[in-house]
Amino acid sequence: PRPQGNRLTILTNAGGPGVLATDALIRQGGELAKLAPETIAALDEFLPPHWSHQNPVDILGDADPDRYVKAVEIVAKDPNSDGLLVILTPQAMTDPTKIAEKLKAFFESAQPLLKNKTLLASWMGGEEVEAGELLLNQAGIFTFPFPDGAAQVFNYMGHYSYNLKGLYETPTLPMDEVENRSLATSVIDSVRRSGRT
């Protein structure tokens, strides 16, 4: 779905790509979602002590599939976020395909929970992560080769949603509308009585 606002949560296994996404997001008017205290506390329960403790949520380079899925499940529930960008960089302990398989299963089973959240992924690494990208695409998750591009797309989607909302909004009538209508009616009646057209 399109984002309902401009607040994005970024989850990554590497700090640098999270910063790239953050810079692109903020440069175009988006903002990092401020994670709720409950979200931070839930992440603290299972992430290593040296995780980022803020958005972007850096779950560290040794993140296995279970850590990824549990972290995604927690941040996806955060009420302060309009979207989620999951970033993966291949590292020695990373299995991009297995992580994508588990995320695909989670996304497919959690649709009611995620119905108002925009989900994007950046699976960095080219051919090495291709199989994982395909799995995420099959689950309806758009994937991008670079995190800054994903953040830009989130912003574009947010602007589009905002503009659509404006198009369908019924404008309010000014309070002096009744007086103007009366004046217009009297002018038209006067013109008709005088025989002018």
Please identify what each model-predicted range represents.
Residues 1-12, 16, 22-32, 101-197:
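Peripheral docking tails and interdomain loops at the edges
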Residues 44-45, 95, 131, 155:
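Short Asp/Glu-rich motifs
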Residues 91-95, 126-127:
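Short, small-residue-enriched loops and turns at beta-alpha junctions
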Residues 3-89, 98:
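Short glycine-cluster motifs
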Residues 41-42, 92, 152-153:
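Short secondary-structure capping/turn micro-motifs that flank functional sites
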